[in-house]
Amino acid sequence: MAANVPPSAETLSSGAAAHPSNTAEEIANQYNLLPKLIPYLDRHLVFPLLEFSSGQDDEKEIVRAKYELLKHTNMTDYVANLWKEINNSDDIPDEFVKKREEVLAKLQQYEEESAKITQLLQDESVVANLRSDKVANLKFLEEQHGVTVEMVNSLYDYGRFQYSCGSYGNAAELLYQFRVLSTDNDKVASATWGKFASEILTTSWEAAMEEVQKVKDSIETRLFNNPLGQLQNRSWLIHWSLFPFFNHDPARDVLTDLFFSPAYINTIQTNCPWILRYLAAAVITNRNRAHKNSSVYQKQLKDLIRVVRQEGYEYNDPITDFIKALYVDFDFEEAQKKLGEAEEVLRSDFFLVSTTDAFVEAARHLISESYCKIHQRIDIKDLSTRLGLNQDEGEKWIVNLIRDTRVDAKIDYKEGTVIMNHPPQSVYQQVIEKTKGAFFRTQVLSAAVAK
């Protein structure tokens, strides 16, 4: 209905940012990505991001931004309430009353126009006769039940109108029904984007992930000869995918692979390098997942380091700076500093707030592992400081690290040190490793020349 309210930030994200200190607030503001994200999101998808910001920014400005965002939608009751809040008034202008009446009348009209076809699509005996061939389906419905192309298109119009009213569940169903029957490729593509947004806004993450694949396939086929169109549509898909990326655990691996695929990592580097923040957060937190020691994770980390190094001149924030400090510059003090800043940025980011603790935990492990690899004798107090822990916490951390990673090390509690046993690599083994690397590079060059 017209009175519907978009889903809240709490509904779409599984955490909330605490009120930061002044320094933390400055860091959060400096690296706020909202202005960069908005151009790539539908206005309904922007709403929860604005609501999330209401705890961090000026409340009046946020209310005004919500009003400007939604005033052209059909959510008339909610928009009217925003107007009253902005103007500190209990009364609303006649234009809101008039628009509400128009919206309700239009809803009634669409419902009547689509009544016949929606009833048919709910009839199991009719649905049982439908096949994967849309042309055959439309012919069957036309001959047996008098369905016209106009009736099918009414599902599309009704679905879009329901979406504009904030009735996302109804919109998803209507757009799905339209897509089953329509042969209009442009409208089908539009309906797929609409259904994707509707599934996001109803937090139907499994259904949303199905739409990710459908949108991706549509981009590859419909825009095959339009590189600029592909770039723009892939950019939108990347941004919209952030919703399931950090709210639906099974989506994490699928979307990480998608973002690292050649077409999409090229899109990120070309059009939206700020997405590296989200890719970095995903890869770092993936360390805590089941495949943390697998070749898949190691490849993701290597790819991330490569892209962060390449794009450092174009985009950086404390999350990407942490990667650079640890794996490019091997600067542990800088890595510790950037980890502290990254924590504040994560807590102020709508998509990443719920991953903050996991990120910090995983990042500390990565610092420890890297530090232990290049030092023979490690001062527990020094390493604890680098991890942002006191000595007792650091000692427990190191004990757990040795146990979990099964490294060959022993703790000298009297001296307060950890002694790492790094077995020397034979010259023979070093030659083998270097030969493997040279052979791989030769294969890559040969493949490139062959193209």
UniProtKB/Swiss-Prot annotation:
Residues 1-21 are annotated as: Disordered. It is found in: Cytoplasm. SMART domains: eIF3_N (SM01186), PINT (SM00088). Residues 10-21 have a biased composition (Polar residues). GO terms for molecular function: translation initiation factor activity. Coiled coil: none annotated. GO terms for biological process: formation of cytoplasmic translation initiation complex; translational initiation. Pfam families: eIF3_N (PF09440), EIF3E_C (PF21357), PCI (PF01399). Residues 256-425 form the PCI domain. Component of the eukaryotic translation initiation factor 3 (eIF-3) complex, which is involved in protein synthesis of a specialized repertoire of mRNAs and, together with other initiation factors, stimulates binding of mRNA and methionyl-tRNAi to the 40S ribosome. The eIF-3 complex specifically targets and initiates translation of a subset of mRNAs involved in cell proliferation. Component of the eukaryotic translation initiation factor 3 (eIF-3) complex. This is Eukaryotic translation initiation factor 3 subunit E. The lineage of its organism: Eukaryota, Fungi, Dikarya, Ascomycota, Pezizomycotina.
